[in-house]
């Protein structure tokens, strides 16, 4: 399999994306965000974008080292960061992490559920353990994070919950039964929770990105990276949702590269 680039090895975001991100500077001043999957890929980009917009950020993820790296970068932006290694499938551990983050930074105003795992395989080759892991992380993990931050948001009668799903949460593909099932589940979970929380003043938003250049995307020859979204493009969508007026709810945001629509690739 072709080697996949690290977060540091990927090219910077397009200038238009960088310019758009810069326009959000200061828009989240005084706010606290919690991000899962914060050490790599979309979670990393989102954490940095939230900090650049003025938020203090609690960084949750499996591995301490990448979380510490992101925390250092956030400190360089003049914001506070709290790095806490946690497995989102462990509900008690997630609740403990949320409490620790609230003690360190304050209660969450924004929570971004970005942690996810892959599970691409034809059904006859899909290992049951792999399927269970995908459902546990990509669906149950989201529920665990939302439950952990929700009490404080209920007290405040406001908050933003952003779920990073996938365009595969609306679009099935052959060879992706396990992953697609988990993302359909993530979308359904989030939209159901959105209906529950309208009256509480809490917005639930689902971002459905497709073809994002992250380390675990299929090899470059299967999807040319120059034609893919950059993680910062997804982070930009999160900032847009996080700064919407409280009375506005945009439940679903499909995000794909224009080139994919014009010249699809398989």
Language model regions located:
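Conserved glycine-rich cofactor-binding loop
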Residues: 32, 39-41
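Conserved glycine-rich Rossmann-like NAD(P)H-binding loop of the short-chain dehydrogenase/reductase
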Residues: 55-69
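The beta1-alpha1 cofactor-binding region of Rossmann-like NAD(H)/NADP(H)-dependent oxidoreductases
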Residues: 85-96, 128
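Substrate-binding pocket helix/loop in short-chain dehydrogenase/reductase
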Residues: 122-123, 127-135
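Active-site helix of classical SDR
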Residues: 146, 182
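Residue(s) in the substrate-gating loop at a strand-loop-helix junction
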Residues: 166
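C-terminal helical subdomain
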Residues: 199-202, 206-207, 222-263
């Amino acid at each position: 399999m072709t080697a996949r680039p690290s977060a540091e090895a990927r090219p910077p975001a397009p200038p238009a994306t960088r310019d758009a991100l810069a326009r959000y500077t200061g828009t989240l001043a005084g706010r606290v965000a919690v991000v899962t999957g914060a050490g790599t890929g979309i979670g990393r980009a989102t954490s940095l974008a939230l900090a650049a917009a003025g938020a203090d950020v609690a960084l949750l993820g499996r591995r301490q080292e990448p979380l510490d790296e992101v925390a250092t970068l956030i400190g360089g932006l003049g914001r506070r960061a709290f790095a806490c290694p946690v497995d989102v499938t462990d509900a008690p551990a997630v609740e403990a992490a949320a409490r620790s983050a609230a003690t360190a930074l304050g209660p969450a105003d924004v929570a971004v559920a970005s942690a996810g795992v892959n599970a691409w395989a034809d059904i006859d080759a899909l290992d049951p353990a792999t399927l269970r892991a995908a459902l546990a992380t990509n669906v149950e993990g989201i529920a665990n994070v939302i439950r952990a931050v929700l009490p404080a948001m209920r007290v405040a009668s406001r908050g933003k919950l952003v779920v990073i799903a996938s365009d595969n949460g609306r679009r099935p593909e052959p060879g992706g039964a396990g992953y697609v099932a988990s993302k359909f589940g993530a979308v359904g979970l989030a939209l159901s929770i959105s209906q529950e929380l309208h009256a509480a003043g809490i917005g639930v938003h689902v971002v459905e990105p497709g073809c994002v250049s992250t380390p675990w995307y299929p090899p470059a020859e299967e999807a040319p990276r120059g034609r893919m979204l950059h993680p910062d493009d997804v982070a930009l969508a999160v900032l847009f949702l996080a700064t919407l007026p409280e009375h506005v709810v945009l439940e679903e945001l499909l995000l794909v590269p224009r080139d994919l629509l014009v010249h699809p690739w398989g």
